[in-house]
């Protein structure tokens, strides 16, 4: 299948293009805001076509799918254009700036009969799938709590709009909290009901938050605590799941690489948990292509993207107001 890229992004260059090509897909054209940017990206990535007019690119009936990795405020319009042109869409998170916009994208894809997926890469990780399996099999009993620690140092080449442009969707909440919301939903199989939160600009953010802590209430009664930041170079990342019969400790697993350690602790002692170390993006592409072929579903579909955005927006509102916020899924939950 021939693909168009909407956005000449770092994630496309470092991960997604290689994953598409590894699956035998043809990355045919890239769109960006300027001809110079699109042309340079195309040259560097060995892509034959480039341009600034997405509608013209979408008019090519030979294009079967679009990967969207532009800045966040562009996702909604670009996805709707691609969907209405009959293309399958893999869209970066957050899907949009509002839950209503994201829900509109999902509804449009359903009406058009195309696959619409959210690129939540962490649920493609072998480590996360192993943790989910342990929980589902009852190895730790009833889940009591989940702790997500995802405070990192944002590399210089990724800062830009993420640390100073609220209009483009900057800030750590749409960048990382949205991922952690998906992780919690994936692992626990339920949607957060309400959240409390506190956020700060702790040295990197200029007009946007660069650090946030939040606690989420789950329907089962489990509690989730999440910590995300752009300003913590030595914190490490990971997750802990604690249950009535055991605990799971997964360290170094909140990354784009298939790395980290997973351990299960029960009354019998501590044991290392093996997991497959496949490429996360290769898995995401494989699941997407299976869905296109009618043989499965994407790793994270559009509804998953709506839900993760809803949680992230509730976290921001809770932090802004200092009050507990119910999560508004816009009818998608």
Tell what function each PLM region has.
Residues 104-121, 141-146:
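Rossmann-fold dehydrogenase core element
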Residues 45-108:
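Beta-loop-alpha module in the N-terminal Rossmann-like domain of NAD(P)-dependent dehydrogenases
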Residues 12, 51, 91, 116-118, ...:
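Hydrophobic residues in well-ordered beta-strands that form the structural core
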Residues 1-45:
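N-terminal Rossmann-like dinucleotide-binding module
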């Amino acid at each position: 299948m021939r693909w168009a890229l909407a956005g000449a992004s770092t994630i496309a260059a470092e991960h997604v293009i290689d994953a598409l090509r590894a699956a035998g897909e043809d990355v045919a054209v890239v769109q960006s805001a300027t001809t110079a940017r699109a042309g340079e990206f195309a040259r560097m990535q060995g892509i034959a076509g480039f341009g600034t007019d997405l509608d013209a690119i979408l008019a090519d009936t030979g294009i079967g799918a679009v990967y969207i990795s532009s800045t966040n405020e562009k996702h909604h319009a670009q996805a709707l254009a691609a969907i209405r042109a009959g293309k399958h869409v893999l869209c970066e998170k957050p899907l949009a700036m509002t839950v209503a916009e994201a829900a509109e994208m999902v509804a449009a894809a359903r009406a058009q009969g195309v696959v619409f997926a959210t690129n939540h890469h962490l649920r493609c990780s072998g480590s996360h799938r192993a943790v989910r399996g342990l929980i589902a099999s009852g190895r730790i009993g009833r889940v009591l709590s989940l702790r997500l620690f995802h405070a990192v140092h944002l590399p210089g080449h990724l800062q830009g709009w993420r640390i100073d442009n609220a209009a483009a969707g900057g800030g750590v909440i749409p960048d990382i909290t949205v991922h952690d919301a998906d992780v919690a939903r994936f692992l626990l199989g339920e949607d957060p009901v309400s959240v409390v939160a506190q956020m700060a600009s702790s040295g990197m953010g200029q007009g946007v938050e660069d650090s946030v802590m939040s606690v989420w209430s789950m329907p089962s009664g489990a509690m989730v605590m999440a910590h995300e930041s752009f300003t913590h170079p030595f914190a490490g990342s990971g997750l802990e799941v604690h249950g009535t019969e055991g605990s799971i400790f997964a360290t170094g697993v909140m990354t784009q690489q298939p790395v980290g350690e997973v351990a299960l602790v029960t009354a019998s002692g501590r044991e290392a948990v093996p997991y497959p170390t496949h490429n996360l993006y290769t898995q995401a592409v494989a699941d997407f292509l299976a869905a296109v072929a009618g043989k499965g579903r994407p790793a994270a579909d559009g509804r998953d993207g709506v839900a993760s955005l809803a949680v992230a927006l509730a976290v921001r509102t809770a932090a802004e107001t200092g009050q507990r916020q119910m999560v508004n899924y816009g009818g998608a939950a």
